């Protein structure tokens, strides 16, 4: 489950 990847992705 990508949680931090999603946060870094939108950054």
UniProtKB/Swiss-Prot annotation:
<feature type="modified residue" description="Pyrrolidone carboxylic acid">
    <location>
        <position position="1"/>
    </location>
</feature>
<comment type="function">
    <text>Tachykinins are active peptides which excite neurons, evoke behavioral responses, are potent vasodilators and secretagogues, and contract (directly or indirectly) many smooth muscles.</text>
</comment>
<dbReference type="GO" id="GO:0005576">
    <property type="term" value="C:extracellular region"/>
</dbReference>
<feature type="modified residue" description="Methionine amide">
    <location>
        <position position="11"/>
    </location>
</feature>
<keyword id="KW-0027">Amidation</keyword>
<dbReference type="InterPro" id="IPR013055">
    <property type="entry name" value="Tachy_Neuro_lke_CS"/>
</dbReference>
<keyword id="KW-0527">Neuropeptide</keyword>
<protein>
    <recommendedName>
        <fullName>Eledoisin</fullName>
    </recommendedName>
</protein>
<comment type="similarity">
    <text>Belongs to the tachykinin family.</text>
</comment>
<dbReference type="GO" id="GO:0007218">
    <property type="term" value="P:neuropeptide signaling pathway"/>
</dbReference>
<keyword id="KW-0964">Secreted</keyword>
<keyword id="KW-0873">Pyrrolidone carboxylic acid</keyword>
